[in-house]
């Protein structure tokens, strides 16, 4: 018997709901009550705030246990993260769906199989996720082709529209960081394709491929680190909340406040790995389209690189603004644009990328998504090796 059911009622679930049921309920309701969906409702922001608080309390085992036993008086409100931030980290912003699609975590949360009972068919879930991911990539590739077609028709108008997009998307939760991540992949993938024109073993092309490969591996390791950090934080919070008499209320509040950033940063790392892997494949579909002529593909690559650089400028602009820099929403402190100098080493280029966060030991483990008592690995698409990397470039762009 729970003392209060208000948070359960807000999510529309019973007090016996599983973690998966709570997550799915939040995913559905958050998209319904999000302020962007209800611009004329003066209560929209409040409703979204309450929904976010309910989800954060009930999705944390320690907080949920305290809420069930004592109601709202037993939970730490200081540990509540801005609902707009947590929504963006879990499911992304709808403003960015035309660029990154539905994030993998959102796809996992929305799978119907989550409510089918305690028995999970991991192979079936993996196959569903692969299908959803393929549909996501194909849809994004078509959108990107249409967008780059504007570059072919009118370059000046394309640049003007891209700059307007930056102004619009920068206002979304973590919009600047999203733009920076998207811009980085666009620039690197375009540079790799444009490098195919070189002779002498296609050295620029191979260099870009190795840079992309190295960045991809680093991104996956960082994602694993993020998952591991979340696991450690969850276990430590359980330990802190279950220990009696060894801490003051002020000490516990300080601990929870200090780890807000760890939670957001860890979720961000997982999302970055998903976004980057997806966009790499999308760019390959667009820039290696067998139905397009060679010169058209080169024009697409030039347009993609231009778009990526415009997106990356949002990060530089925000970091030159003291008001932007003072906001706690910032995830990174590095301000160097990824493509200020394309001749710099991969190491220096990576140093400013948005996967960076607090210096943590790199985990050698691959993240495993857990369902009930079973686990399975969700593999993001890997970048394809450069065809003919060890041969003279005869099949690339001439």
Swiss-Prot record:
Q: Which UniProt keywords apply?
A: Chaperone
PANTHER family named among the record's database cross-references: CHAPERONE PROTEIN DNAJ 10, DNAJ HEAT SHOCK N-TERMINAL DOMAIN-CONTAINING PROTEIN
Q: What is this protein called?
A: Chaperone protein dnaJ 10
Which InterPro entries does this UniProt record tie to the protein? DnaJ_domain (IPR001623), DnaJ_domain_CS (IPR018253), DnaJ_X (IPR026894), EMIR (IPR052423), J_dom_sf (IPR036869)
- Region (Disordered): which ranges? 315-398
A family per Pfam: DnaJ-X
Keyword Chaperone part of the UniProt annotation: yes
- Comp. bias (Polar residues): 326-335, 343-362
Q: Does the keyword Translocase apply?
A: no
Q: Which family, according to the similarity comment?
A: Belongs to the DnaJ family. C/III subfamily.
Name the gene behind this protein: ATJ10
What is the organism field in this record? Arabidopsis thaliana (Mouse-ear cress)
| Biological role | Plays a continuous role in plant development probably in the structural organization of compartments.
J domain location, by residue? 6-71
């Amino acid at each position: 018997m729970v003392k209060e059911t208000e948070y359960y009622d807000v999510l529309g679930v019973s007090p016996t709901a599983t973690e998966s049921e709570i997550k799915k309920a939040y995913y559905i309701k958050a998209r319904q009550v999000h302020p962007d969906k209800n611009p004329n409702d003066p209560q929209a922001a409040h409703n979204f705030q309450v929904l976010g608080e309910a989800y954060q309390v009930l999705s944390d085992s320690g907080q949920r246990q305290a809420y069930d036993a004592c109601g709202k008086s037993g939970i730490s409100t200081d540990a509540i993260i801005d609902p707009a931030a947590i929504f963006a980290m879990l499911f992304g912003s709808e403003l960015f769906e035309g660029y990154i699609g539905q994030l993998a975590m959102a796809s996992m949360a929305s799978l119907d199989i989550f409510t089918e009972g305690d028995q999970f068919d991991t192979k079936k879930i993996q196959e569903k996720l692969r299908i959803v991911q393929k549909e996501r990539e194909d849809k994004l590739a078509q959108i990107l082709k249409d967008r780059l077609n504007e570059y072919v028709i009118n370059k000046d108008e394309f640049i003007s529209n891209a700059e307007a997009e930056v102004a619009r998307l920068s206002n979304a939760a973590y919009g600047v960081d999203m733009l920076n991540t998207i811009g980085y992949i666009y620039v690197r993938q375009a540079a790799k394709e444009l490098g195919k024109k070189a002779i002498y073993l296609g050295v620029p092309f191979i260099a870009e491929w190795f840079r992309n490969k190295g960045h991809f591996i680093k991104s996956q390791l960082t994602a694993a680190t993020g998952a591991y950090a979340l696991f450690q934080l969850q276990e430590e919070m359980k330990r802190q909340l279950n220990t009696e008499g060894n801490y003051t209320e002020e000490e516990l509040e300080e601990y929870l406040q200090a780890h807000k950033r760890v939670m957001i940063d860890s979720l961000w790392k997982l999302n970055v790995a998903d976004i980057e892997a997806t966009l790499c494949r999308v760019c390959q579909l667009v820039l290696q389209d067998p139905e397009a002529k060679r010169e058209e593909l080169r024009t697409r690559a030039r347009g993609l690189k231009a778009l990526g650089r415009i997106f990356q400028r949002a990060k530089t602009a925000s970091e030159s603004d003291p008001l932007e820099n003072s906001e706690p929403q910032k995830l990174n402190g590095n301000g160097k644009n990824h493509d200020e100098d394309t001749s710099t080493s991969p190491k220096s280029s990576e140093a400013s990328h948005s996967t960076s966060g607090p210096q943590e030991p790199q985990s050698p483990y691959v993240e495993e998504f857990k369902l009930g008592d079973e686990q399975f690995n969700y593999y993001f698409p890997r970048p394809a090796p450069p065809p003919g990397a060890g041969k003279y470039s005869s099949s690339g762009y001439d």
